[in-house]
Amino acid sequence: MSQKLVLILNCGSSSLKFSILDPKTGEEKLSGLAEAFYLDDARIKWKLHGEKGNAELGKGAAHSEALNFIVNNIFPLDPTLKDGIVAIGHRIVHGGEKFTSSVIVTDEVVKGIEDAIQFAPLHNPAHLIGIKEAFKIFPHLKDKNVVVFDTAFHQTMPEEAYLYALPYSLYKEHGVRRYGAHGTSHYFVSREAAKRLGVAEDKVNVITCHLGNGGSVSAVRHGQCIDTSMGLTPLEGLVMGTRCGDIDPAIMFYMHDTLGMSVEEINTTLTKKSGLLGLTEVTSDCRFAEDNYDNEDESLRVPAKRAMDVYCYRLAKYIGSYMAVIGERLDAIVFTGGIGENSAHVREITLNHLKLFGYQLDQEKNLAARFGNEGIITADNTPIAMVIPTNEELVIAQDTARLCIKD
């Protein structure tokens, strides 16, 4: 009997990430990215059984053309792929309060995703396009589509964690509250940490740090999220690649009233021109800050050090505050995501801020835990910090299989 495979779709406003996984073994058969949708140079790249390929999709191509290319041009390279796909999993950025776990797509579920568009105006419409196109291209799997929400893991937060100190009517009538993001990643690494530490999943206490171009920290007590750094939108919290994270809200009034900036200009500044990009005035790429932190060239060292120091200081503040929130035994601090998994420097500076709590970095272990490697990075007999590569696709595949595939 052929393997039962899951097709995973992550539709952005101008891109589509895709992969095919065996949910039992975690083996990735195919992965790829279609990007630059609606532009003249829309394109697709993929890796099939380790072999890379790429192609132009055509002027103005988008989600439909990308999915059709996958089916008509990539699948024939290995006919077992299409035959093996028995379900489709979709990553959804925002599920509002309605969804606390992954669910099979129904008309009611689609309505719920539509209702949450107000909180994710770029992402949720694109996710709905992905669902619609999947129905069209794989009609025999219409009842085998599952949505996995980035916000679901954070729905266990208590009221004191998710409410803003705003008029309560804004929450009651409009749903203005903290929702968080990266929940699938925080869920995965918290479970993996429990396994590695020999702690039951419903007992594990960890602080998980998902650090990539976007970044967030979550406090996980007894296996459940009790707080997270992102809020109503993914703008709140840590310093990120181009996002400012926490700021005094009155800065926006100053930008509007005194500097004469429009609401659109302010939004663009906070979401696309701030963070590491704003601090370095060069790039949103954390590697610039890491590579030039000790550069003899002052023009490179100063912006790199400024950005890195602010980034790590703010990260350490969140970790320290979440130690207080967890309020009991802390099993580990877990680093994941592109920066969390690969930047030994970010981890070093951050943990140096936490020496009060007994954290002592092991330099050799820290340098070893990069580029796909994992492990504990602190000295023996000291509080544990560790690196665990995330695998959101595996969570999506496993949730999809759990709901759709009968052994």
UniProtKB/Swiss-Prot annotation:
Keyword set includes Chloroplast: no
Q: Which reaction does it catalyse?
A: acetate + ATP = acetyl phosphate + ADP
Query: What is the name attached to this protein's record?
Result: Acetate kinase
Q: How does it assemble?
A: Homodimer.
Enzyme Commission number, as recorded: 2.7.2.1
Q: Where is this site: Transition state stabilizer?
A: H182, R243
Cofactor(s) recorded for this entry are:
Mg(2+); Mn(2+)
| Compartments (UniProt record) | Cytoplasm
UniProt keywords, alphabetically: ATP-binding, Cytoplasm, Kinase, Magnesium, Metal-binding, Nucleotide-binding, Transferase
Native organism = Mannheimia succiniciproducens (strain KCTC 0769BP / MBEL55E)
Q: How is this protein annotated for GO cellular component? A: cytosol
**Record-listed substrate binding positions:** R91
The catalytic residues are D150 (proton donor/acceptor)
The gene designation is ackA
The annotated pathway is: Metabolic intermediate biosynthesis; acetyl-CoA biosynthesis; acetyl-CoA from acetate: step 1/2
Can you quote the record's cofactor note? Mg(2+). Can also accept Mn(2+).
Tell me yes or no: is Nucleus among this UniProt entry's keywords: no
Give the superkingdom in one word: Bacteria
**What's an example GO BP annotation here?**
acetate metabolic process
Q: Where does Mg(2+) bind?
A: N10, E392
Annotated ATP binding lies at K17, H210, L211, G212, N213, G214, D285, C286, R287, G338, I339, G340, E341, N342
Q: Which family does it belong to?
A: Belongs to the acetokinase family.
